């Protein structure tokens, strides 16, 4: 018999069951076979999975197959009928490229810990260098970018005594650093970092499939891993750190060490702050930029007698330009914060996540005024850092909420939209070409979960790589549901989408307030 095919994109809830397309089911399965069990195999393993066929759905056994192959939302599975109810399954990623599997067998099919054995380095889990235990070489796996995390190889963790708590700093070749919190999976002891890995890869030009090498250059206190330059293949096994690090990297490492001393000696340093209690040092954290909010140290506010003040606060840069922000006090904790303008202030002054700044209170009467002080190594030791106040329990809880939210964002970045007749104006042009005033609603849970609002700049990316600019507007005064206005008509025409068809889109953030909705595939697929 000729090999027949059908393929399905994996949508939320796909673990429970997979629906066989109606046309394929009626033509090649219904009424033809007495048995109700399909046999599935893939190139990733010699094992054959038996999956129950319940009507038009694959049920019992399907979840085991999906988990064993580490299938994710957005992946595409292609079924080729080899004989009777025996199928060969080809597994594709969202980009329609084949998912790469290593030599690891998927025959050990425990649904929990063995899941990650299916793919080689599924989330960027790396391999230690046999010559230098302080180094490891890893591959940027698509899943590590998809879930914004990097796992450390167990050999490297064991040899260097790395634990799943505390902080770690990743430093590139030029000395720029990224801070992460170490985590550990209770079920199997895997140590990993999450949130910020995608930003690190983007900044250093690392893409899916690239290899990279890290070397542990500092063990005491906060761990520091340095990204080593890629070497020719014949030298790839010899991983070594130059005897003298680049000056920028060395200075950055010293900065990290100074920050540690601040954390270890909060009380002693706070006492010496009497030299200049009007100053404090703060860290520009990713969460402060995302939420446009800076928490002010309690000790600083209290010592200057302004811990009860509300209203407005003015920030002035070195050139005298000013920004007016809202000053508020959280009733639950008494923590002071400034918002609505902090992100603009940072952007205008070249401050990015991870930057260290010094602010000085130069006016207490009427509206409070903080001035940005130039960062100089000599002055940095004279101005006592109260950044640990900013990293108070309140901030830690805030960051933990952000971490959980990022995890949810990663899992909910796909959305399915249906081109309903309601969204199409009554006058249709030739062969489903739609009028210019067409719009498309976005699901409320999707926009809320991903922090999309009316100020978000959104672009639509079609299957040909062409971008269509659209505008987000609230549908009514309740300001709940957003609709895309403009660009939608050209976008659906470019993707050949007609009335009552559904498409799956992927959300990709480019900057803090700008994002792209990328066309993945049509949900309802026709058998060719």
UniProtKB/Swiss-Prot annotation:
Gene Ontology molecular functions: sequence-specific DNA binding
Record flagged with keyword Iron: no
Protein name according to UniProt: Putative B3 domain-containing protein REM15
Disordered: annotated span: 234-253
The keyword Transmembrane belongs to this UniProt entry's keyword annotation: no
Domain of life: Eukaryota
Keyword list, A-Z: DNA-binding, Nucleus, Repeat, Transcription, Transcription regulation
Record field: transmembrane: none
UniProt xrefs under InterPro entries: B3_DNA-bd, DNA-bd_pseudobarrel_sf, REM_fam
Entries under Pfam families matching the protein: B3
Gene for this chain: REM15.15
Organism: Arabidopsis thaliana
Subcellular location as annotated: Nucleus
Residue ranges flagged as DNA-binding region: 3-95, 135-231, 279-376, 425-522
Major subcellular site: nucleus
CDD domains, per the entry: B3_DNA
